[in-house]
Amino acid sequence: MAASCPCGSNRTYALCCEIAHKHHANVITPEQLMRSRYSAHVLGLVDYVVNTYHPSCHAEEQREGIAESIENDWCKLEVVKAEAGSNENEGFVEFNAYFDEDGKRYCMTERSRFVKEDGLWYYIDGTFPEEEPEQDPRLNQSVSSLKVGRNDPCICGSGKKFKKCCG
């Protein structure tokens, strides 16, 4: 039985990302490029990852860092959403890529931007969702059980001392 593609498409590698890995021009959509770049990370195809960055990114200068990121133990890809950009030569793909490190599983979430230039799709940049700010555990308590010292930061979040704000 043929090996399934690392990108999670439920197709064989030969009928999925290998087509892109053999020739960048075979990539038709931003999602296909994103999936093939993920598979290249899994398979250690540094050249493919470098060559599918937009030329303005100067990825060749970052080859060593790219090679290090490929060394992670990538284990799963989930495509959350693929959407068109502001024109036919721009697209976005939001995804979760899971990897194992030091016995723990981590998830990298990104919204990648792709541009099409001279008939080829390229990865140009991405944004990462901001982490939720840690909530003050005192906010989960009832008001009657809340113990706030006069010099503690105010529970309203103003940054002032409790005694000079709500105390």
UniProtKB/Swiss-Prot annotation:
Please give one Pfam family short name: YchJ_M-like
On the tree of life, the source organism's domain of life is Bacteria
Q: Which InterPro entries match?
A: NTF2-like_dom_sf, SEC_C_motif, UPF0225, YchJ-like_M
The family note in this entry says: Belongs to the UPF0225 family.
Protein name (database record): UPF0225 protein VV1358
Q: Which organism is it from?
A: Vibrio vulnificus (strain YJ016)
